[in-house]
C-alpha cells in the first residue's frame, strides 16, 4: 500500500481498451468550463500513458488529460488539471491505459479547482457558514464522531495532515 495508514490499494491490469471508472457519491458533478484537479499515487510495471477523463453518465468524454506513468516499484505522484467540456451532474472519472500494463493505485483525488480558500470546501456552503458570524460551529457531529466502536471513533489528530497519509475510517453509513 501507499503507506502504513492506507490499508488498501487498487491493482489493475489494463487490457487494450480497458477502463476503470468511479461514479463518486451518486455521480461526479461536472460543469462545462469548470476546472478540476486530479492527482493519484501509482506504481507501474511498465512505462505507459494513462488518460484520465471526466465522463458523462453514459461515458461521453467531457474533458481529459494524459499522464506519462513510469515503470517504478515505488509510488509516484501524478497530477493534471481537467476542464469540463460539458455539464452532467451524474458524471464519472475514468482511467484508461494506452497499452497492457499493471498499475497499483494507492490514492486518487479529484476536486474542483475553485473551492473556499483553496481548502476543498464548496464556496457556497462555506460562505453561508461564514456569513452566520458564528463564534462556534460543531462539525462533524452526532454519530460520525463516535464511530462504530471506540477503536474507529474519529480522533482529531488523525484528521489533519496530507489526506493520503491519514488513516481511512469506516463511518456509520458504511462508506
Language-model regions: role of each:
Residues 1-175:
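Extracellular and organelle-lumenal recognition/adhesion modules and their flexible linkers in secreted
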Amino acid at each position: 500500500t501507499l503507506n502504513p495508514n492506507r490499508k488498501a490499494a487498487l491493482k489493475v491490469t489494463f487490457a487494450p481498451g480497458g477502463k476503470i471508472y468511479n461514479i463518486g457519491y451518486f455521480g461526479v458533478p461536472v460543469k462545462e468550463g469548470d476546472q478540476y484537479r486530479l492527482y493519484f499515487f501509482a506504481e507501474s510495471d511498465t512505462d505507459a500513458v494513462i488518460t484520465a477523463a471526466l465522463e458523462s453518465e453514459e461515458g461521453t468524454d467531457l474533458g481529459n488529460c494524459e499522464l506519462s506513468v513510469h515503470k517504478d516499484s515505488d509510488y509516484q505522484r501524478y497530477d493534471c488539471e481537467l476542464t469540463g467540456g460539458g455539464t452532467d451532474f451524474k458524471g464519472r472519472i475514468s482511467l484508461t491505459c494506452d497499452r497492457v500494463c499493471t498499475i497499483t493505485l494507492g490514492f486518487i483525488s479529484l476536486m474542483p479547482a475553485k473551492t473556499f480558500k483553496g481548502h476543498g470546501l464548496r464556496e457556497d456552503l462555506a460562505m453561508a457558514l461564514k456569513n452566520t458570524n458564528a463564534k462556534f460551529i460543531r462539525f462533524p457531529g452526532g454519530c460520525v464522531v463516535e464511530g462504530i466502536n471506540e477503536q474507529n471513533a474519529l480522533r482529531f489528530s488523525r484528521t489533519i495532515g496530507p489526506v493520503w497519509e491519514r488513516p481511512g475510517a469506516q463511518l456509520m453509513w458504511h462508506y
